[in-house]
Amino acid sequence: MVESIAAGQVSDNKHIEMWKVKKLISKLEHCKGNGTSMVSLIIPPKDDINKYGKLLTGEMSAAQNIKSRITKQSVVTAITSTKEKLKLYKQTPTNGLCLYCGVIYMEDGKTEKKINFDFEPFRPINQFLYFCGGKFQTEPLLSLLADDDKFGFIIVDGNGALYATLQGNSREILQKITVELPKKHRKGGQSSVRFARLREEKRHNYLRKVAELANQNFITNDRPNVTGIVLAGNAAFKNELAETDMLDKRLLPVICAVVDVSYGGENGLNEAITLAAEALTNVKFVAEKKLVSKFFEEIALDTGMIVFGVDDTMKALELGAVETVLLFEELDINRYVLKNPVKGDTKTIYLNSTQQKDSKYFKDRETGMDLDVVSEDSLAEWLCHNYQNYGAQVEFITDKSQEGFQFVKGFGGIGGFLRYKVDIEDHHGDLGAGGDDFDPDTDFI
């Protein structure tokens, strides 16, 4: 088997790319070789690709000293495959290059198979790795799975405000301002009323300034440039900012946490990052819940603007009617293209793991003749590589939330929002592959 995920095939949807990497890591980790028959090579961005060709040549020479004939042959085969893949690249791709080549055992533990993976990661891996052994080294790929959502922080108190972003483990201070607000006036009489009014006016102007700078720092091209915003402070300022209409309406929906901190400035930022950690983790979780809840609402309202089940969803996708595909990240359905060897016509079917073991799906219904398998793909992987051809987007759903669990159990783990209504033959009584029959009385909790 030869698999190549070459530069230029990178999707603009980071969650899809992360899903692909997660599946690839799982596939690589399940590969077992005979002795030292598997090569892992990761080349960092901007490195001279020619020096790695020389590295492999040196490793090839060293392999000639291996006494065991079988081991020597395995190592030479793996290094040769890696060199051949490396020759396909004149220079190191922008984000670096990952190569995994070698000979592995099949599930029976006896049959051997040659596999080659080469791909440019969807973001840089700034780490060199060369390893020749009985398994692939995937640890550097784990960095690609770190969610790089950017979050904004506003730390505000009576001394000033700080604006910052947090992306992964990297934080950036965007702006700092200081303020001198008048203290409360202890004397009575008319002067206290006047001072109180002036103090309140300055406080109001200060908060308005904080809000204006929030707009400047966290809105780009008329939309928020961060996934979520954390408001933090050691006084009532943060609460007033969240509850008044000073903040731009476009920012209000992305406020994910309001936390009390003991300090202002950078110390307050450090504390806010710690206190808001759970809220930041839940942002994607909440977004998923909202998306699936909207899907359920469309069903309840019978708008005709959603589709579910593998057969209906794929039919609507082929018609170009699906705007967003909802896809269970562990979807256990394969896509088969079958060909009648006599008539020459082909058909596409979708089978879950149980159905794949039933030979009836691979026979002609009229004649009982065996059909040729033209192609077999994981449906999820096929969608991730082809969704753009249909003008659609893909959103992954987990079964970790109540809504996600319902989506997987009741709707087969696949569905979609439509651009327009389409007339699809009603198969809702039988979802086919991957799902139980949908019962509106039991599948909504």
Curated annotation (Swiss-Prot):
Spell out the subunit comment.
Answer: Heterodimer of two subunits, one of which binds GTP.
Q: What is this protein called?
A: Eukaryotic peptide chain release factor subunit 1
Q: Which coarse location class describes where this protein primarily resides?
A: cytoplasm
Q: InterPro entries per the record? A: eFR1_2_sf, eRF1_1_Pelota, eRF1_1_sf, eRF1_2, eRF1_3, Peptide_chain-rel_eRF1/aRF1, Ribosomal_eL30-like_sf
Per its database record, what is this protein's job?
Answer: Directs the termination of nascent peptide synthesis (translation) in response to the termination codon UGA. In O.trifallax UAA and UAG codes for glutamine.
Pfam families xref list: eRF1_1, eRF1_2, eRF1_3
- Where found, per UniProt? Cytoplasm
Supply one GO molecular-function term. translation release factor activity
User: Which keywords does this chain's UniProt record carry?
Assistant: Cytoplasm, Protein biosynthesis
Where are the annotated coiled coils located? none
The family line of this record is: Belongs to the eukaryotic release factor 1 family.
The yes or no answer to whether the keyword Oxidoreductase is present is no
Q: GO terms for CC? A: cytoplasm
| Keyword field contains Protein biosynthesis | yes
- Organism's domain of life? Eukaryota
